[in-house]
């Protein structure tokens, strides 16, 4: 989506990184409808690394006692790694799902 926003149009990629833990976020294209919503309603896009997602996932499991799907850990990364400009009085909501959990795959990360 970052590349699509930069170019001003939905982009299609010939190849994608299929070695990511966030496989549900690794679409080879930005959908037209989603692109229009992002263009209109999203103020900023924060890119995250594989290592940050793995660490975020570990923290969610160990500290919050929840087991999200790996892609959901991407939502928690900006908070864990201070990538947001939040004051101590800020309120933040992170929506987390677990519909695509592969416990063997998660176990292999740690």
Residue positions per predicted region:
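Active-site-adjacent helical/loop segments in soluble small-molecule enzymes
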Residues: 31-89
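Glycine-rich phosphate/pyrophosphate-binding loop at beta-loop-alpha junctions
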Residues: 1-40, 88-110
């Amino acid at each position: 989506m970052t590349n699509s926003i930069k170019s001003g149009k939905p982009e299609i990629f010939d190849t994608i990184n299929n070695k990511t833990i966030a496989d549900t976020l690794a679409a080879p294209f930005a959908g037209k409808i989603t692109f229009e919503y992002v263009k209109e309603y999203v103020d900023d896009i924060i890119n995250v690394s594989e290592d940050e997602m793995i660490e975020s996932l570990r923290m969610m499991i160990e500290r919050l006692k929840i087991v999200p799907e790996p892609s959901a850990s991407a939502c928690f990364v900006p908070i864990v790694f201070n990538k947001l400009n939040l004051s101590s009085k800020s309120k933040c909501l992170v929506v987390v799902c677990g519909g695509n959990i592969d416990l063997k795959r998660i176990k292999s990360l740690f």
